[in-house]
Amino acid sequence: MTSHLDDEGLHPMVSTLLGGGTLPTVPFKAYTRERMMELRTTKASMTRPENLSEDFNGEDGKFSPLKWLEHRWEIEGIKNRPMSKKIDSLCAGADENTGLSPQRRAFSSGCKAPTDDKGRDGEYERLGGHGKNWRNGSTGGADKFASRGNDFKPSFQKGNQLERGTRGAEWKKDTTRGAKFAPRREERLTSLSGSEKLPEWADGPTTMDDMIELRGFDEPKKVKNKKNPKEKKEKEAVKAPEPVECVGSRPSSTGLKTSEPIDDPAIAYSSSGGGALPATDQELAALLGCLDIQKTSRKIDGDDMAWAHKSEETAGGTSRLSRFFAKKNKSPELDAMLSSVGGGNDENVANPMLARLFGHSGGDNNASSSGAGDIKGGMRLEDLEKGMESKEPSKVSPLQDPSQQAQLLQHLQKFAKQQAESGQHIHHHRQPTPPNGGPQHQQHLHHPMVHPGMQIIADPSLLASFAQNPVILNAYVENQLQEAVNAAIRANNGQQLPPQLHEQLRMASMRNKAFLQSQTLTFVSLQQQHQNIQQHQQQQQHHQHKGRTPAMIPASVQRQLQKSSSNADQKKEKTSQSPPESNQETSDAHNQSDAMNQLKKLHMQQNYANMVQAMNSGVGWARGNGVVNGQQQHPQQQLPPNVQMLMAQHQQAQMQHLKMMMSRAQQQHMLMAKIAQMQQQQAQMANMQERQGPSHNQQQHQPVVPSELSQVGPIQTPLEKLLASVGVQGSQFTGSGDRIPSSVRPMSLEDLEKQLTAVPK
């Protein structure tokens, strides 16, 4: 029976367990990810089984298990929502028109809570039904639905104890009530009025495409370690290769040294391995032409070599540019360079480049200067602004190649040569030319105010301007310093100069300023001496050529001068006696007479000088006075043309003025004569009336002008004003009706003026 069971009724596994045997273990087989990826591309994996219907294909054309599962659920009558619908709804939520609910759920038909198929009864049964739920207290969760039927309370009903204090005591609602007692009545009123405040979680994006700000993902700020920059500098300095000096040799194309000597010491001492910057200050100064290394190297002793070795060792541990900012003693090379350039010995200037830039000559003293103010290749304002504004570093570091170093030296030498040529050119143009067009003598090579023997190196015109205004000297020195700095910057491809080179230029500028000051003082003293010598020579020449000057003026000349002065005094007296109306005209006449007197005096003095010269030189008076071949020349022919033209214009203006004065004087004399005649007639008529008596007052043989005008009275009529202006006194009138008698013939003002101004024939 047992065997029958084993063979027919029992499962082989059960029979094995009952038989006491062990279950056979299937060997565990695992695949790695790489192996699975390889199996994915095999032919068996790419072949679709025949039992998979094409009706369940997805959008990608492959079999979709979700569609097949949904089909099986529909057949079996399962109404649960399949997973495919959830995925489709998520995909549909990505539409642009789909909005977000306040709970961030997608909705297409408005903002509402999701419906439940089981309804409210299911919720009530879930909370415990009629039984008791110990989780929700003694009420079993029924207090949640207790207030649904009695939300509205009439006005006559009293509120419960929980709602007491809401009227007039709203300040207690947050403190007396707990967090779980919500002010339901206040919420209902605010919902009806539409002034409900949105909660915090309601603010945010309204669509799924809106961008939101993610916070809390910032990395913590790292605290800067003070030791890191120093350690970083030390590491960089250790990594930097030490420069290899190649003195007196030029690197070949194969990278090996050649024994060919270099003529230019700046290139020989500045070229280093890899084309880097010079390692020492001496090489940098030699590169820019500020130091003669061949001359300075002879002065270096054992201590200097030890210091140079020490500086090379320290340069490997720190930055190569730190030597410009380190606070230590000056190097012996720099001291030797300063002493050679600024020393007070009588040797030539050790730096001919700076001497040329600042106007020094190689064979003169340190303070010698050419004084050329204008440089032919000077820098314009636009170039200076471009040089100051260009702060971008060049792609190739400057002075890294011997050719660039030689180019820098060549630019500096060319600039110094141009400055020297421009100084000579300016000095040549400033030489005075002789007025008669004759050849220039040797004395014309110097300034006209400077003696030929004076030792003046600078331009005398500049020294004269410096003597007049010392501010020009300071401006001139600053301009030279700026031009030298700009030239060095241009030669250095626009790169900034090292501080030591800039200091060298400034010290050379100060020495140039001191030299120009001493030259200015020498120029002023020698100029005064030269002026005194010239005055003495002129006096001697005057005594030799013209003889002894007369001690007194001849009596004839004095009489003529006195006569002219007396005529002028007489004219002044006449003009002072004229009426006040012509004061302005007399002043003009006085000025004209003074001018004529001055011209007469000048002519007389010129004639007298010609006469004295003729007498001293033995020439007759006729030739000395301008008489040639029996004909006397006009004095104006001896004057320049412009003076003759001015004199002719002055004479014409004077003649016109004299004509006007004569016509006005004639008119005045005629007017005065007319008035005097009228006064005489009035006096005669008055005498006749007194003799004849009062019986003849009514006769009609009276003159045109009434006798009452002779009486003194107030001036009220235009006729009386006109008569008073010419010196006739008006008459007095006792009454307004007796002023003019009935026998007087009326006469207009125009007729009276015509009669007075009429010229008698």
Curated annotation (Swiss-Prot):
It is found in: Cytoplasm. Keywords: Cytoplasm, Repressor, Translation regulation. One of its GO terms (cellular component) is P granule. It comes from the Eukaryota. Residues 400-410, 557-568, 576-592, 690-702 have a biased composition (Polar residues). PANTHER family: EUKARYOTIC TRANSLATION INITIATION FACTOR 4E TRANSPORTER. This is Translational repressor ifet-1.
